[in-house]
Amino acid sequence: NYPAVLDAARCSPLDGGNLNRVFPGDPRLGPTSALAAFVAREIIPRCRYAMDLHSGGKSSVYTPCTYLHWGGDLAHRRAKLEGARAFGAPSVVISGATANAGSMTAECDRQGVVMVSTELGGGGTIDRRMLGIGRDGVRRALAHWGILRDHPKPELAAPRLLMLQGKGGTPMAETDGIFEPACDLDDAVEDGQIAGRIYPIGELDRAPCDILFRGPGIIVSRRVGSLVRRGDLLYNLASPVDEAGLGIT
């Protein structure tokens, strides 16, 4: 979404649209939706495979992972998981089939195109390690799909499989203030464990607000900015899962 990129934002300054939320798009509904419609009608139907290299943006940072929207039939899901494993990121994070029906991933599912997405870092910066994971992963996936020949495939540890938790287990800011995190990416946390503290601004006599995790899980993303407002997302949690739990054995 070129106008959004120039504005260093997810949403276009032309119409406020987020390209990864408006698929399948409609050319009558503004430039962002028109762009999604072009991709959905003219590009995706010509593809067998697709990749989308994401990061956490300016507001969050992710553990390096491939990210799968768990839609499509059984064979389609298996093909996506195989592509994600070939990519070689340390984790495969899986979201529910209805997590974001307006994403490019969901559109690829609707059209039977095998798509692998990623979350590689974030914070509005370029991290050399994440860049290396992305470059090597693209080459490995292309070799797996038979598009590149003779690409070296170094032995990699099998990625861990994680199912993204719903909002019920996601810590949110309960007040405005400055957030002090108590945990890091990839930490395993327990129900009731402290996630961090929010220090109110302008109310120096008010005690900090402790934020607690509302269930166990593994941290796959965390907020970057210190200043938070009530309702801001602070962490994303995921739970270990195996192929039996995914229903593909």
Question: Whereabouts are the PLM-identified features?
Answer:
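Structured catalytic-domain cores with a bias toward divalent-metal coordination
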Residues: 1-249
